[in-house]
Amino acid sequence: MIDPEIAGSRDAYITLLGRSTWALVNAYHAVLREKGLRPERVSIVTEEPYAEGAPTAARAILMISEGYGFTPAIEIEALPRAEFVRAGAMIRSFAEGLIAQGYGVAIDITSGRKVTVAGALIAISLVGIRIQHIYYLAMQSLDDVAKPYMMIPHQIQRIRDLMEDTAA
């Protein structure tokens, strides 16, 4: 875990890492730039086959955060592959713990595999946990997007907050 040097807001950011480290990193950058979130804690949740990308994602998150003037605590949690019930239970428990500690919780589903995303969202909805944001970086095209967020034309990408979108 990377300890925070600067206390940010009382926000925590849970991000699901699947096949694309770029998707995770770019979604995080978009959330900071477009939504203004400054999480005090970042948790990268991944499945074992994709865990090798997690340290790279953590370093990128740290560098991007520092560029915005803060340093979150970063942790990595690896889960067995395709165990959506276990993934959901772990993410639910993690979110409940963060909320109990006074954090507002945001979840980014952009890079997560469908089974992990489904498990997380089902588990959270069944117990009525109040998640503040569910982020997804929507791309109009997947051509040539494995590069930094600021190098992808903004007209083909849009950070969505599913909680805001469904409340409107």
Regions found by a protein language model. Give the residues of each.
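Short glycine-rich phosphate-binding loop at a beta-alpha junction
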Residues: G104-T110
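Long, low-complexity, Lys/Arg-enriched
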Residues: M1-G104, V115-A168
